[in-house]
């Protein structure tokens, strides 16, 4: 690495803390077994009536993931959700996730109707990167290429030169660095720092963070590893450096699931949103998954390893949005057209450069492969 990380401090917007509280207040109660079965049957009928397909993120509750799989929908990372929706015949997509995912789906499928169970379901990375402040920051550094993570608003994407996911962010930054480009990175400081450390690129880092991953604690993880010495540690790169440093595998949602499936290990400590455990248990039955610690035993946490905005998606509001057709995502046509450019640039790069990674099942051997791939 030829240069230390350079960063610019920005406070989170005033509404963020309130938004967290409001999100937890809006998390729906779990329905009874009888109501759950009735809601699922109702939703199946409404999906058929509306000729709609359900796309869900790995971080939403298990019952929504199950329903998406059972009805021919998709459970995936954020970019694959949008790709699936773009390529599916359905003209109505119901996105169970957070708002930037709905916006990305609309950008890639501008002529389709995009619905969400709750339009208030947002993301701390999105909230922490308001377009006016970010645009001013970019204007102050006109000599830099602007690279933004998928977890941003359509307006922020429209200000960017490149959009990336963790599947290809490292490769794109490495390519830009090799061409002598200097970079503005937004919004996640931990993922940006990880990529900067790997590539040595000249990067100015926006100081955003994921509410969930930012709370994982390196000291507490070290203590947990002592309790489970044979467990392999799976870490999403949005986590702090002290957590990433202890990982056996650093990767995205999809890649962490694959690592759990393909490894010969039987115990895993998982440092990402606990919603992913549903798919991990399906992919690797009989294996044990332990949540990485977000705080000490007597401490409180804002997320406790589960995104409050993801938790706002439930069976009741899913049925309601299909019944009423409200909560539709709209993206200004000009913004959507401009935001698609950095997305297409990433997809074109992936088509030219991406190679399939074959895993051996040996974590010690595969760690180098997993550390550079996967989507958010």
Swiss-Prot record:
Binds 1 [4Fe-4S] cluster per subunit. Signal peptide: none annotated. Its cofactor is [4Fe-4S] cluster. It is found in: Cytoplasm. It catalyses: iminosuccinate + dihydroxyacetone phosphate = quinolinate + phosphate + 2 H2O + H(+). Gene3D superfamilies: NadA-like (3.40.50.10800). Pathway: Cofactor biosynthesis; NAD(+) biosynthesis; quinolinate from iminoaspartate: step 1/1. [4Fe-4S] cluster binds at residues 123, 210, 307. Iminosuccinate binds at residues 57, 78, 149-151, 166, 236-238, 253. GO terms for cellular component: cytosol. Transmembrane segments: none annotated. InterPro entries: NadA, NadA_sf, Quinolinate_synth_A_type1. Its EC number is 2.5.1.72. Its main location: cytoplasm. Catalyzes the condensation of iminoaspartate with dihydroxyacetone phosphate to form quinolinate. Belongs to the quinolinate synthase family. Type 1 subfamily. This is Quinolinate synthase. It comes from Paraburkholderia phymatum (strain DSM 17167 / CIP 108236 / LMG 21445 / STM815) (Burkholderia phymatum). The gene is nadA.
